[in-house]
Every structure is written in structure tokens, then in C-alpha cells.
Amino acid sequence: TQGSVSIGEGGPELAKAMLGKYYEIEYPGVIGVLLTGKPKPWVGPMDVALSIIGKVFKNNFVKNKILEFVGPGVSSMSMDFRNGIDTMTTESACLSSVWATDEQTKRYFEIHKRPDDFKEMKPGHAAMYDGIVEINLDTIVPMIALPFHPSNAYPLADVIADPEKYMTLTEKE
């Protein structure tokens, strides 16, 4: 969310690194996550993250790919909100994620006494992606993740209205 890219490591990757061995990562594809709209006041970063994970995990659409968050919706969210979404992106099975930077990002670096670390990052005019995920932030509602993975994400109101239906879905998994 601050113009950087990191890759999470699991136990096997960490063990290889401790033994001085490398692990291969294929050149990843890049999926554009086009954010439009603005989250409602009662919607938090976890709701947005669960909506994304619910859309892409089970079909492996973003598996081992880089998510690039772009679009006018990015600027509608604070840095803390973006960070909240970003911490959950690994649950989508993506390799990593990167966000377009903006004035809020610049202010974040200034507040943290690192103004020289800010770099403008945005997609080029003719940017091409291996796929696109469109997220209209205006339509996101409070979500809940049921066992056994965050991709079992449903609107909270739906689960409250018919808990038996959603518990049955979870049991089938």
C-alpha cells in the first residue's frame, strides 16, 4: 500500500532459506484490481478483503499472481484501510500485491518523517493485465467468513437471516 512489494513465505520456504537454499518462483502474471466507488461508513477493510477473496480464491484466478490495486476507489480509502485490505490478500492465494500511490500515500510518508521515500506509482496509460477483478466499493456490505477458509465469505445480513443454510454450506465443505 506504500509502493512496495513483499512476498510471504510459508514454513517450507523458510526452512529452505535457513538451509541456504533457494526456491524458484515463476514469473508471475499481474491481475488488475479495479476499485471504483467508496466504502460505506459501516464497511471496513475486512469486508472489502473478504469480498475479494470470496470472488477469486476457489477459481484460482489470482493464484501465484501479483494483484495491482488501481482505480478511483483507491483514493477513497485511508492508508490504514488499504493496509487492512492488503494484509488479507495472501488469503486469496496471490503471490503479492501492490497499490497505486497517491496524495494520501505521500502524506503518510511525510507524517512518518520519510518524505524522500515516496515514489509515484501508477499504471501506465496502456497498462495491460493478465486479468481484471472489478470491485465497486459502493456495493460492499458487512461480510462474515465461515469455516474453514476466508473464501467462505458471505454478507452478514444473509447469514443472520438464514443461518442454517450457511452452516449447511460450510458442513458440505
Task: Please provide the spans of the model-predicted regions.
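Fe-S-dependent hydro-lyases/dehydratases of central metabolism
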Residues: T1-E173
